[in-house]
Design a protein with these regions (language model features):
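Cytosolic juxtamembrane N-terminal segment immediately preceding the first transmembrane helix
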Residues: 1-33
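Juxtamembrane intracellular "pre-TM" segments in multi-pass secondary transporters
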Residues: 9-15, 201-224
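Extracytoplasmic
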Residues: 21-55, 76
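Residue-level signature of mid-helix packing/kink "hotspots" within the transmembrane helices
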Residues: 38, 66-74, 158-159
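Helix-breaking motifs and short loop linkers at transmembrane-helix boundaries and internal kinks
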Residues: 52, 84, 105-111, 122, ...
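Helix-loop-helix hairpin linking two adjacent transmembrane segments in secondary transporters
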Residues: 107, 111, 148-194
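Cytoplasmic helix-loop-helix junction between adjacent transmembrane helices
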Residues: 115-156
Length: 224
């Protein structure tokens, strides 16, 4: 069992030396957001028609996702401080895969909305942890450089989402478009499992106490 009182310099060193892998992981984790929203958009008219749903219901699949994504990060931060980044990442990406499968197989619009809400919660865990990893491993200047490289990868992912989503929807149907999110998440999960060690040097056993939660909330709100 890892001590909560001792830093973990060996793990930090391995991660720092493998900057290329860290950049790739960051790009994929941050890329979950445009993949989950932009790739989904071309499929929205088809799935709305397929379910015989209203446009209001269709828009709710996006609204619920984004609300869950935003609010869940208030809790994922303290949880990752208490348990570490790796458990939160693995748990988050696992839930994302399950929710993405549920979206692709959804029998009706209500099930899709529920699955998209869960997907937003899972996406919040992954995106929050990605930003925290940079703070764990690098000084501000070096961290900005690493994040800049990751954002370049994110931009590439974002640019391909709408064309890929449109192609899959037109040629294979909206369920296949949503299934591509499962593949993206599985690849990301495999890389996390194989190549990502814990980046947090010291766990915080008090992270879930009311005082710590309030401090974290104020910090997040101040950056909005």
């Amino acid at each position: 069992m890892k001590s909560i009182d001792q830093p973990l310099p060996a793990q930090e060193g391995r991660l720092k030396r493998n900057t290329a892998m860290i950049v790739l992981l960051l790009a994929l984790l941050l890329g979950l957001q445009p993949v989950t929203t932009d790739l989904y958009l071309p499929a929205l008219p088809a799935l709305t028609q397929g379910f015989g749903a209203s446009m209001v219901q269709a828009q709710l699949t996006l609204t619920a996702l984004l609300l869950a994504f935003g609010t869940s990060q208030l809790f994922w931060g303290p949880l990752s401080d208490k348990w570490g980044r790796r458990p939160i990442l693995l748990g988050g990406i696992f839930v994302y895969v399950i929710s993405a499968i549920t979206c692709a197989l959804a029998p009706n619009m209500e099930a899709l909305i529920a699955a998209r809400t869960l997907q937003g919660v899972a996406m919040g865990a992954c995106v929050m942890a990605a930003r925290a990893i940079v703070r764990d491993l690098y000084e501000p200047t070096e961290g900005a450089r690493v994040m800049s490289q990751a954002l370049s990868g994110l931009g590439l992912i974002a640019c391909t989402c709408v064309p890929v989503g449109g192609f899959l929807t037109d040629w294979m149907g909206w369920r296949w478009a949503l299934s591509s999110l499962v593949l993206f998440a599985l690849v990301t999960a495999l890389l996390i499992y194989l190549y990502f060690d814990e980046s947090l040097q010291q766990l915080n056993p008090h992270a879930l106490q009311a005082k710590s939660l309030w401090a974290s909330t104020k910090k997040i709100v101040s950056h909005l």
